[in-house]
């Protein structure tokens, strides 16, 4: 859905996912919505290894906490950017609040997600993500928390990254 929104806003968009079924569903959804964009079955690392056309923007939403080597994904995303390009990661903080909201409430109490979707030890503290970014020559531009209201089914931004959060990082230019 994010890929479709970016394409509707005028972006030339390539959406990737490692799963064939997810790519098939996304392709059909975009076609039915009349949105023009490309989808490929690939991981960030696979795309990086075969891509010769750097991106202005890479988004990696709600993935890092589900992969065995999140630093590898951060590095691949950094290497997909041209100088001055930005990457936005969305993930979950390893905190008590995140555990209560994501695992206890969303998975066990409200049933918004299947039980076992998340593992607390795979959540990523903002400082860890920032360190991985710096290790791949990215600089942190912004970080903001994201919260969810189950009664209205709406997401909203909050100042502190207590549970879900987004971090925007940039690849420096020659002038930086």
Language model features: what each stretch is:
Residues 32-47:
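Conserved SAM-binding strand-loop segment of SAM-dependent methyltransferases
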Residues 45-58:
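A short acidic, Gly/Pro-enriched loop at the edge of an enzyme's catalytic core
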Residues 19-21:
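Conserved SAM/SAH-binding beta-strand->alpha-helix loop
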Residues 86-110:
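Conserved class I S-adenosyl-L-methionine
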Residues 71-86:
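A short glycine-rich, Lys/Arg-flanked "PGG" loop and its adjoining helix->strand segment in the class I
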Residues 1-10:
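Conserved SAM-binding loop of SAM-dependent methyltransferases across substrates and taxa
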Residues 120-143:
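Short alpha-helix
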Residues 91, 108-128:
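Acceptor-substrate binding/catalytic loop of class I
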């Amino acid at each position: 859905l994010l890929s479709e929104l970016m394409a509707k806003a005028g972006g030339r968009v390539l959406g990737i996912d490692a799963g064939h079924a997810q790519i098939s569903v996304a392709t059909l959804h975009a076609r039915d919505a009349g949105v023009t964009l490309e989808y490929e079955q690939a991981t960030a690392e696979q795309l990086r290894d075969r891509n010769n056309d750097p991106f202005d923007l890479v988004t990696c939403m709600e993935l890092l906490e589900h992969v065995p080597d999140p630093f590898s994904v951060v590095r691949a995303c950094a290497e997909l950017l041209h100088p001055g390009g930005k990457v936005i990661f969305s993930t979950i903080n390893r905190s008590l609040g995140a555990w209560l909201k994501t695992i206890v409430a969303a998975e066990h109490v409200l049933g918004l997600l299947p039980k076992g979707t998340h593992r607390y030890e795979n959540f990523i503290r903002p400082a860890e993500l920032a360190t991985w970014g710096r290790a791949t020559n990215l600089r942190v531009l912004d970080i903001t928390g994201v919260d969810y209201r189950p009664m209205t089914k709406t997401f909203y931004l909050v100042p502190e990254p207590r549970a879900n959060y987004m971090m925007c990082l940039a690849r420096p230019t020659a002038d930086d």
